[in-house]
A protein has these predicted regions:
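Mixed-charge interfacial surface used for oligomerization/domain docking
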Residues: 1-149
């Protein structure tokens, strides 16, 4: 099992959007000035995690625009990284922090776009949620293990 996990640990893409920059500031991930400016401009950041690295991916002005950015990025990853345009050999995951309504909307959009895909929706773990705050929404894709199919 350890060999399989070591081999596939970088074979996933995760996109996260936040409703507030407060928790990134508290955790020291952004400066107080960046948090104040982002809050003033009502920026909804879209972050990406690929492997062990968390990076800024894009900025949106509305939650709807942030979700659209995440779905577009996910579609690109499915096509180019996973070579699975229809998500038939890929798991799709949605996670949220106290944002079940938006998570269900995102799940409906994914089901419409990828009718045969395995889609899971769940709350984010507390170990992550405490760093990004309530209202956050994430979408992820990861390749299915051939050993389990």
């Amino acid at each position: 099992i350890k060999e399989i996990l070591e081999r596939v640990k970088y074979e996933s893409s995760i996109y996260v959007t936040l409703t507030t920059l407060k928790y990134l500031k508290k955790g020291g991930r952004i400066t107080p000035a960046a948090a104040a400016l982002g809050t003033l401009l009502r920026i909804k950041p879209v972050l990406t995690i690929q492997g062990e690295k968390l990076d800024a991916f894009s900025k949106a002005r509305t939650a709807k625009q942030a979700r659209s950015i995440m779905l577009t990025a996910l579609a690109k990853d499915l096509d180019e990284r996973f070579h699975d345009k229809n998500a038939e050999h890929t798991y799709l995951e949605i996670a949220h922090t106290c944002n079940e309504e938006d998570a269900k909307e995102l799940e409906a959009a994914l089901k419409e776009q990828y009718p045969g895909a395995d889609i899971t929706t769940a709350p984010l773990s507390l170990s992550i949620a405490c760093h990004i705050g309530p209202g956050s929404l994430a979408v992820a894709c990861s390749g299915k293990l051939k050993e389990l199919e």
